[in-house]
């Protein structure tokens, strides 16, 4: 088989002084950071959908890319050609993982029977590609939002037959993920939301979604899948309002249906932007709630109200994200999946490499800066000092439930409390972070 990216052998680390645009300048897989190889810290993955399925179409124009596997032809043959190119790309980019939706890798077909048969054939193809290349599956998922049947959602659809079709896709995709050794299975809401409350029963839809997720957990245990189940929050788009709005909202949902010990979060940077949060906030919130699982690394545009899915390029933003992740012990089954696409005008096939190389260098440099912050320990020290009062006898009695509200009121009066505000020193801390970022 002739190589598609025939002008490139493999992307290699050449260091920061190199001017080669098809080389890594900061990402050195074997470099030790805090005693662990950089590759093991970052656990990079490339996604199938934006990289090999998107044809460059948008709401105002048709497809702009010339991809051989997107031309007319026999669907399964084209899917196999796409897999050839995908694994050539993964190998040449040095990513240890990839991610997919079911219909990214396999033709959907005209019926459930065709869908299942096509997917089974493509799972065998992917298994062979993984064996040959050493690339592993970070996570799989089912696309329960693109087909018109999902216009009113999948699990939240008013029609139980649509709910059942979605269940079939999730069963099939999860079992495929299990067979391929996937380390996680992702559930993204897609169209699990509403356009107008005039035709929506919020309680009914929430109950449906909760039961669907309970069944997903039940099936995971039934088939012996040892990976992590992940929900990916997003506030809107394609629906006006989605039920998995942000990390805190999903936590409340999971608690309501007794799922908080079973499902974690896959946090996407651009979705945080759409929810009015920083990426840093959503990562820190997921960690604080005990739900952190994995990351879709990309960026949005603060001036635009939609999911632009650009490649991450801000070391400043991602250094703080990696700092939170390192403090929490790093990834376990999760990783950094590049849920990002080249721009519509980026029509050269090697633009796919430029986007990923820049993103991988960005995250590698962010990791090294975060490691310096961890080793120095000054930020943690400042936070510990700020909350040190809670280690006092009074603070501990409050936290351990040894004092009631009335007890505290009595204590405050008896001790004539007159606390004085202590500076938060935000400006000083921002200068400290800039020191880590810019001072060698």
From Swiss-Prot:
Could you say which cofactors this protein requires?
Mg(2+)
The parts of the chain that form a coiled coil are: none
Cellular component (GO) terms are:
cytoplasm
- Which GO molecular function annotations are given, in alphabetical order? magnesium ion binding; xylose isomerase activity
| Cellular compartment(s) | Cytoplasm
Instruction: Look up the domain of life of the source.
Output: Bacteria
Keyword terms, alphabetized: Carbohydrate metabolism, Cytoplasm, Isomerase, Magnesium, Metal-binding, Xylose metabolism
Among the record's GO biological process terms, what is one?
Answer: D-xylose metabolic process
Q: What is its EC number?
A: 5.3.1.5
Q: Which catalytic reaction applies to this protein? A: alpha-D-xylose = alpha-D-xylulofuranose
Q: Which SUPFAM superfamilies match?
A: Xylose isomerase-like (SSF51658)
Query: Where along the chain is the active site annotated?
Result: 101, 104
* Comment on bound cofactor: Binds 2 magnesium ions per subunit.
Binding-site list for Mg(2+) 1: 232, 268, 296, 339
Record-listed Mg(2+) 2 binding positions: 268, 271, 307, 309
Sequence similarity: Belongs to the xylose isomerase family.
Complex formation: Homotetramer.
- Its protein name is Xylose isomerase
């Amino acid at each position: 088989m002739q190589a598609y990216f025939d002008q490139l052998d493999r992307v290699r680390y050449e260091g920061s002084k190199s001017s080669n645009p098809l080389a890594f300048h900061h990402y050195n897989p074997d470099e030790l950071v805090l005693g662990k190889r950089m590759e093991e810290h970052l656990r990079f993955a490339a996604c199938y959908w934006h990289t090999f399925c998107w044809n460059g179409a948008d709401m105002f124009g048709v497809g702009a890319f010339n991809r051989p596997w997107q031309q007319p032809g026999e669907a399964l043959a084209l899917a196999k050609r796409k897999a050839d190119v995908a694994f050539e790309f993964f190998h040449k980019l040095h990513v240890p993982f990839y991610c997919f939706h079911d219909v990214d890798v396999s033709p959907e077909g005209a019926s459930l029977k065709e869908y299942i048969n096509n997917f089974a054939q493509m799972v065998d193809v992917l298994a062979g590609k993984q064996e040959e290349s050493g690339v592993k599956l970070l996570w799989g998922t089912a696309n329960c939002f693109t087909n018109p049947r999902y216009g009113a959602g999948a699990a939240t659809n008013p029609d139980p037959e649509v709910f059942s079709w979605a269940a079939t896709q999730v069963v099939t995709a999860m079992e495929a993920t299990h067979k391929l050794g996937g380390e996680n299975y992702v559930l993204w809401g897609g169209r699990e939301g509403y356009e107008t409350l005039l035709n929506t029963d919020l309680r009914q839809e929430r109950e449906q979604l909760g039961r669907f997720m309970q069944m997903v957990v039940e099936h995971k245990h039934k088939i012996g899948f040892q990976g992590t189940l992940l929900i990916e929050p997003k506030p809107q788009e394609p629906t006006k309002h989605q039920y998995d709005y942000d990390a805190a909202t999903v936590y409340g949902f999971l608690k309501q249906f007794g799922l908080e010990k079973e499902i974690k979060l896959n946090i996407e940077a651009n979705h945080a932007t759409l929810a009015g949060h920083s990426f840093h906030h959503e990562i820190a919130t997921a960690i604080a709630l005990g739900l952190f699982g994995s990351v879709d690394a990309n960026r949005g545009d603060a001036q635009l109200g939609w999911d632009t899915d650009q490649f991450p390029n801000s070391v400043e933003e991602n250094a703080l994200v990696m700092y939170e992740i390192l403090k929490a012990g790093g990834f376990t089954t999760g990783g950094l999946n590049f849920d990002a696409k080249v721009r519509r005008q980026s029509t050269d096939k090697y633009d796919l490499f430029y986007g990923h190389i820049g993103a991988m260098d960005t995250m590698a440099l962010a990791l090294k800066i975060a490691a310096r912050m961890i080793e120095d320990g000054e930020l943690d020290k400042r936070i510990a000092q700020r909350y040190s009062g809670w280690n006092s006898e009074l603070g501990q009695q409050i936290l351990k439930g040894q004092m009631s509200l009335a007890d505290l009121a009595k204590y405050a009066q008896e001790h004539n409390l007159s606390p004085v505000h202590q500076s938060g020193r935000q400006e000083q801390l921002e200068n400290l972070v800039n020191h880590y970022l810019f001072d060698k």
